[in-house]
């Protein structure tokens, strides 16, 4: 068995490292894109299983390397919660990103508009794909998935746009959601 002194010492060290990581400077990070997402995880608190919402920010450096910048438990994905996370990143020296990838949560989009108005925003293709399938009958999932993948992996922006129009035309006729 592990003694409570060992647990206390270990917790103090982990807490100290966690606090240092959460307050580290981001001024020298060559971050050009951000991926922002809220996720729900199941945890045990006071011997009871419960769900908590985590706000996660991943930075993408100029060389394509991904860096975890923030993971915060804020009680949900409200505009205020996301604004607090974004303000903290800016306070730590994060420069204005060139591009944002988001999950589509309304609170996040409002917080972004308040902090980085004008930065291009793209809906995460994984979230969009899940949303499409959630609104379609299961018998169409494979075909919709194949068409969607074909569209998002097109080689040029012109090809993407042509495939997007084709996707919309086909699926508006085949399945009105």
Where are these regions (language model features)?
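RNase H-like nuclease fold core
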Residues: 4-101, 106, 110, 114-118
